[in-house]
Amino acid sequence: MSIEQTYKDIKSLKIQGASNISDSAIKEIKILVKNSTAKKPHLLTEEIESSIERLKSARPTEPETENYLNYINYFSKRVVTQKISELKKEIIKEINNIE
């Protein structure tokens, strides 16, 4: 899937239930991080933030998803590194901890 497809599936109620919505959104952010071609950490965090905002807008009344995505966004901005590979590794590790 993709961020956009997951957004559409959540919005159209194809994906329902708090846990299913959270799981799908988190999975897509993880895939985004793994596959990102961003060359600098700040570009990756911008990409994450943009994607998170898109996913949250699909079902704004879903607090569980919003909380998880906000945490991932917060965490991604707090990792101090100049290496994109280290940032990706830390974010994926943190996502694995909450999955």
Label every model-predicted segment.
Residues 91-99:
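Active-site pocket-lining segments that scaffold enzyme catalytic pockets across diverse folds
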